[in-house]
Regions:
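DNA polymerase sliding clamps and clamp-related checkpoint/processivity subunits
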Residues: 1-211, 217-347
């Protein structure tokens, strides 16, 4: 049988997805967003064109590793907001070489502009393997300064420990002559939110990869026979795949009170729901209505989830639209996240 082809994210969709889709991360202990002035290392050279400082090297490392799982080369935009409540730091919006997966991400940092800083967008493109391997020399308590020397195309970053005057590792990365290759997606709305335990979803994806399946089918079903007014609405979220020698199905049940449904609001399906739905197993197909069903590449899904650490994951689904999966970064800023947008497989 001929292998399914992977659809690219269309130009129409590239004009759709807005940043307001991100949901607040869970409350976390307050930690510094970037080094205090007394902790920063002094540069011995003239002021750089721009500089970004981070107080937690572990966050920057996690950020880069998750982006690097998908992108071999990445363009980072340096963003500085004049609004104290606005976003300043590193922003990513790039599509992979196969033009199948879009990565949107941002990480807060303190941005300083030098007198020679260029007007308009500022950024750099580097090979991700060089960046992530260099960041491994830092520990969780270390700070990171990242800057572009005046008049240079290189990017330099230094990893150091606060209040310690000993030698700090410094790396100079050659940048690639490549700009931002994506216009992004704006205004895309989703009708289905599926909340599922990260280890549960990652286990199904890993099993599909181990069995050499190319695609994973994500589906949402609802019983054709509805309960009496006021009774819970039952949904079934099913992960399945068909490999050459193994086929598998992972069904999950969810119960949502009918009164909770509001027109214009997405339906939230909690695959981790342990409340009784009245069903011992997934009913036969003839007793179910298909709410959503689409297929996505196992390889991309595996790279998405392998570096994640949060306990729960939210999948945004809608027929004919790409899968949207968002990973809040934590830290002191709730605006920091990595978002993966994956086009479905063509049948």
């Amino acid at each position: 049988m001929e292998a399914p082809q992977q659809s690219a994210i269309s130009e129409e969709l590239e004009e759709l997805l807005a940043h307001d889709l991100s949901e607040p991360a869970a409350a976390l202990p307050e930690v510094p967003r970037y080094p205090a002035p007394k902790h920063r290392k002094r540069d011995s050279t003239e002021p750089p064109d721009w500089k970004v400082s981070f107080a937690q090297s572990v966050l920057l490392r996690t950020f880069c590793e998750n982006v690097g799982n998908i992108l071999t080369e990445c363009y980072f935009e340096v963003v500085r907001s004049e609004d104290p409540d606005g976003f300043s730091g590193l922003s990513v919006e790039s599509i992979d070489q196969g033009r199948v997966c879009l990565v949107q991400a941002r990480l807060s940092g303190q941005v300083t502009l030098g007198p020679g800083a260029p007007a308009g967008p500022r950024g750099f493109c580097v090979r991700m393997s060089n960046l992530t391997s260099s960041l491994k020399s830092g520990h969780a308590c270390h700070f990171v300064d990242l800057w572009q020397p005046a008049g240079s195309s290189d990017v330099v970053f230094r990893i150091y420990e606060p209040n310690v005057s000993n030698y700090a590792p410094e790396f100079t990365l050659r940048t690639l002559a490549k700009g931002n290759d994506c216009q992004g997606l704006n205004g895309l709305e989703y009708n289905l939110f599926v909340e599922i335990d990260l280890e549960t979803f990652r286990g199904a994806v890993r099993m599909a990869k181990d069995h050499k399946a190319d695609v994973l089918t994500l589906a949402v079903y609802a019983p054709k026979k509805k309960g009496p007014p006021g009774s819970p609405d039952v949904s079934f979220f099913v992960i399945s795949y068909d490999a050459d020698e193994v086929s598998s199905k992972f069904p999950y049940q969810s119960s949502t009170e009918s009164e909770a449904h509001v027109d214009g609001k997405p339906t939230v399906i909690r695959a981790n729901d342990t409340s009784s739905t009245g069903y011992d197993c997934l009913p036969p197909e003839e007793e179910l209505d298909t709410v959503f069903s689409d297929r996505f590449g196992v390889e991309h899904l595996f790279h998405f989830v392998r570096g994640m650490e949060r306990r729960e994951l939210t999948l945004r689904l809608d027929q004919g639209k790409p899968l949207l999966l968002e990973y809040p970064m934590g830290g002191s800023s709730r605006a920091d996240y990595i978002r993966f947008v994956l086009a479905p497989k063509i049948q």
